[in-house]
């Protein structure tokens, strides 16, 4: 490990690896570090991702594909089922990944592009001089290093320390984080062609239960519960999950279990300072509805890698420059989708189970494989006029997209 690089990327998840790969492909000298000894472990997500969006970043490799889904099914509290084709099921439906293999493959791609990759290497602080981030202090195999870099990219996940060290407010309120529990189960009778989502305040307050098939009778079964819906004397997410698994998959065996938090806050005020950018969960770039963040992380990582090249080439790594080449670009793309999802989340978290059932009853006969904006508006208006009014900004934006695509 040298003491000077063009770019130092802290965290080798999808955001960090794509950022490192992109910057290295531009000819920059890049160091990508990961605090754990194995990239991709532990897995902390359902592992679902949209096919076409994924193909923008990588060639599909069967080694890290567990399942190829046709679509998704959403179940309301009374069991009403809404079936949607894969194309309109959102960013988490399409392929189910083997994240341990996938994340390592992304890091390998970064290394192939020319980045130096170091595992079991932890950042312990930033080097800040004259209000500019100049690098970081690292710990590797018990030895301390000072590594300087023209740009630091913080991709250290939901527990990010890099942002806090840089003076960026990434604090999450209870309403801004979902506490999650997930089991990998085996030996269960599971539909291997569709992922399933279960909603309801009795089942998952302020969140949902997910079932993502992984082939061979295996599936990721998990739950996310909004922090504001939890309390000292209320059941824990794992208690809700145990109840669901016992009822839905009584013969299943638990093979793995993971626990963690997912940011669902929407965009934070800033994600860059002099000499530093945040990406992925560290920048709170996950979807506020689903908590899914793989694709957003990869999109933002690519933008950050490109921004690092532009800023370094211009000899200007100031926050003003980084806002121009990174902040504005991700907010106009990834950030726009996050903002729209936040509107929906804030409307739906206050719905009762009766409201959710009413919506499901109105939507169950809609042909989602060819659903138009008008179809959805009519169904929502029939089910809940107040909800439609609360979502008016979202539909106004969607209508603009329809008009733009037709011109």
UniProtKB/Swiss-Prot annotation:
Pfam families in the record: FAD_oxidored, GGR_cat
Enumerate the GO terms in the molecular function aspect.
Answer: flavin adenine dinucleotide binding; geranylgeranyl reductase activity; oxidoreductase activity, acting on the CH-CH group of donors, iron-sulfur protein as acceptor; oxidoreductase activity, acting on the CH-CH group of donors, NAD or NADP as acceptor
Q: Which SUPFAM superfamilies match?
A: FAD/NAD(P)-binding domain
Q: Which enzyme class, named as a word?
A: oxidoreductase
Provide the E.C. number(s) assigned to this enzyme: 1.3.7.11
- Entries under InterPro entries matching the protein: DGGGPL_reductase, FAD/NAD-bd_sf, Geranylgeranyl_Rdtase_fam, Geranylgeranyl_reductase, GGR_cat
Q: Quote the cofactor binding remark.
A: Binds 1 FAD per subunit.
Q: Which GO terms describe its cellular component?
A: membrane
Q: Please, which domain of life does this record's source organism belong to? A: Archaea
Q: Which reaction does it catalyse?
A: a 2,3-bis-O-phytanyl-sn-glycerol 1-phospholipid + 8 oxidized 2[4Fe-4S]-[ferredoxin] = a 2,3-bis-O-(geranylgeranyl)-sn-glycerol 1-phospholipid + 8 reduced 2[4Fe-4S]-[ferredoxin] + 16 H(+); 2,3-bis-O-(phytanyl)-sn-glycerol 1-phosphate + 8 oxidized 2[4Fe-4S]-[ferredoxin] = 2,3-bis-O-(geranylgeranyl)-sn-glycerol 1-phosphate + 8 reduced 2[4Fe-4S]-[ferredoxin] + 16 H(+); a 2,3-bis-O-phytanyl-sn-glycerol 1-phospholipid + 8 A = a 2,3-bis-O-(geranylgeranyl)-sn-glycerol 1-phospholipid + 8 AH2; CDP-2,3-bis-O-(geranylgeranyl)-sn-glycerol + 8 AH2 = CDP-2,3-bis-O-(phytanyl)-sn-glycerol + 8 A
A biological process term (GO) from this entry: membrane lipid biosynthetic process
Gene3D superfamilies reported in the protein's UniProt record: D-Amino Acid Oxidase, subunit A, domain 2, FAD/NAD(P)-binding domain
Known pathway: Membrane lipid metabolism; glycerophospholipid metabolism
**Obligatory cofactor(s):** FAD
Report keywords, A-Z.
FAD, Flavoprotein, Lipid biosynthesis, Lipid metabolism, Oxidoreductase, Phospholipid biosynthesis, Phospholipid metabolism
Q: Where does FAD bind?
A: 15, 34, 45-46, 48, 99, 123, 281, 293-294
Mention any additional remark: Reduction reaction proceeds via syn addition of hydrogen for double bonds.
Q: Which HAMAP family match?
A: DGGGPL_reductase
Q: What does this protein do?
A: Is involved in the reduction of 2,3-digeranylgeranylglycerophospholipids (unsaturated archaeols) into 2,3-diphytanylglycerophospholipids (saturated archaeols) in the biosynthesis of archaeal membrane lipids. Catalyzes the formation of archaetidic acid (2,3-di-O-phytanyl-sn-glyceryl phosphate) from 2,3-di-O-geranylgeranylglyceryl phosphate (DGGGP) via the hydrogenation of each double bond of the isoprenoid chains.
Family, as annotated: Belongs to the geranylgeranyl reductase family. DGGGPL reductase subfamily.
Q: What is this protein called?
A: Digeranylgeranylglycerophospholipid reductase
Q: Which organism is it from?
A: Methanosarcina mazei (strain ATCC BAA-159 / DSM 3647 / Goe1 / Go1 / JCM 11833 / OCM 88)
Upper taxonomic lineage: Archaea, Methanobacteriati, Methanobacteriota, Stenosarchaea group, Methanomicrobia
């Amino acid at each position: 490990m040298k003491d000077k690089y063009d770019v130092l990327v802290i965290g080798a998840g999808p955001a960090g690896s794509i950022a490192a790969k992109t910057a290295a492909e531009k000819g920059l000298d890049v160091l990508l570090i990961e605090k754990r000894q194995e990239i991709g472990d532990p897995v902390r997500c359902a592992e679902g991702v949209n096919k076409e969006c994924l193909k923008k970043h990588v060639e599909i490799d069967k080694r890290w594909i567990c399942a190829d889904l046709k679509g998704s099914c959403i179940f309301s509290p009374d069991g009403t089922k809404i079936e949607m084709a894969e194309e309109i099921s959102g960013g988490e439906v399409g392929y189910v990944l083997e994240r341990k293999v996938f994340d390592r493959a992304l890091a390998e791609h970064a290394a192939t592009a020319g980045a130096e990759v170091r595992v079991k290497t932890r950042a312990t602080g930033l080097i800040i001089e004259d209000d500019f981030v100049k690098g970081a202090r690292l710990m590797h195999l018990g030895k301390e290093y000072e590594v300087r870099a023209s740009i630091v990219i913080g991709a250290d996940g939901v527990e990010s320390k890099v942002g806090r060290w840089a003076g960026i407010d990434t604090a999450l309120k209870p309403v801004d984080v979902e506490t999650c529990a997930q089991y990998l189960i085996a030996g269960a009778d599971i539909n291997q062609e569709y992922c399933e989502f279960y909603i309801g305040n009795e089942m998952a307050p302020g969140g949902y239960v997910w079932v993502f098939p992984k082939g061979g009778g295996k599936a990721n079964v998990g739950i996310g519960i909004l922090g504001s819906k939890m309390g000292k004397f209320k059941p824990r997410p794992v208690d809700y999950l145990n109840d669901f698994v016992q009822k839905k998959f009584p013969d299943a065996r638990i093979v793995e279990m993971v626990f963690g938090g997912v940011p669902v806050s929407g965009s934070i005020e800033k994600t860059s300072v002099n000499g530093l950018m945040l990406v992925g969960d560290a920048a709170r770039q996950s979807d506020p509805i689903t908590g899914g963040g793989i694709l957003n992380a990869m999109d933002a990582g690519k933008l950050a890698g490109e921004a690092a090249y532009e800023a370094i080439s211009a000899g200007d790594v100031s926050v003003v420059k980084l806002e121009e080449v990174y902040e504005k670009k991700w907010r106009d793309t990834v950030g726009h989708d996050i903002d729209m999802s936040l509107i929906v989340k804030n409307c739906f978290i206050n719905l009762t189970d009766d409201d959710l059932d009413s919506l499901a009853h109105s939507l169950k006969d809609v042909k989602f494989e060819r659903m138009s904006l008008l179809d959805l508006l009519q169904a929502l208006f029939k089910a809940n006029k107040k909800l439609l009014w609360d979502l008016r900004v979202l539909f106004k934006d969607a209508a603009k997209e329809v008009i733009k695509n037709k011109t």
